[in-house]
Amino acid sequence: KRAVPKSKPVCYVENEVPAAGVLAHHLEQGTLGEAPIWTDLRTFAAEPWRGVVDCVIGGYPCQPFSIAGKRLGKSDPRHLWPFIERIVETTEPAYCFFENVPLHLRDGFDEVAGSLHGMGFEVAAGLFAAAEVGAPHERERLFILAAHTERARSTGLGKGDTSSIFGGWEWRGAEDVQSILDAPFERGNRWPQPLLRGMDDGLAHRYERLQIVGNGVVPQQAAYALHVLSTALEL
């Protein structure tokens, strides 16, 4: 919505149960456009969506390429690009917008870019950090925008202005730190959680929530990436 105000989702696909729960919560709260949720990208039936979808958006698993994983690349069973490729080829969108970790440039990006070129897309990609839009942390990510050489001309991206991309951050300074130090701390209280990732490591039952926070992308960051890459493609 920040980047393309008139856009609306027609379906979601999310395999991880905790992440799907967060997605369902936002649908209930009305912070995301209402649409059905599918659970398995590998078996997702794309045929009914042919000609219905203008843009395929995805953050396919980063574990095959992330420095935090074993970096097995295409041999990792979580490598889902071939299934996304099938969906793109079947639905015939005008645009594709993807996100992944920076190391994807070294391993796997050539396959993705070559596949998109083979399907008739022009591709622009770049590294963008959340700090570029004012966030108090780096969170660098690779964003990929693909525009079909024929379909993109007739559809149009419908970009909004950049006013909603920058700003909107709640900064905390010395007064906030001092208020934490001055606050009484009694037995049984939890220590304040960190600003940068929103929560502490905690116990094992809190792992899934921390994982979701770590995998997240700052909305302004994605909107800024879309704006820059679409300008590079002269959209």
Feature annotation, model-predicted:
Residues 21, 39, 79-86, 220, ...:
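Short, contiguous clusters of charged residues that form electrostatic/catalytic patches at enzyme active sites
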Residues 1-42:
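SAM cofactor-binding core of SAM-dependent methyltransferases
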Residues 226-234:
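Short, hydrophobic alpha-helical segments
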Residues 44-55, 60-215, 219:
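Class I S-adenosyl-L-methionine
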Residues 24, 66, 223:
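A short local structural element in Rossmann-fold oxidoreductases
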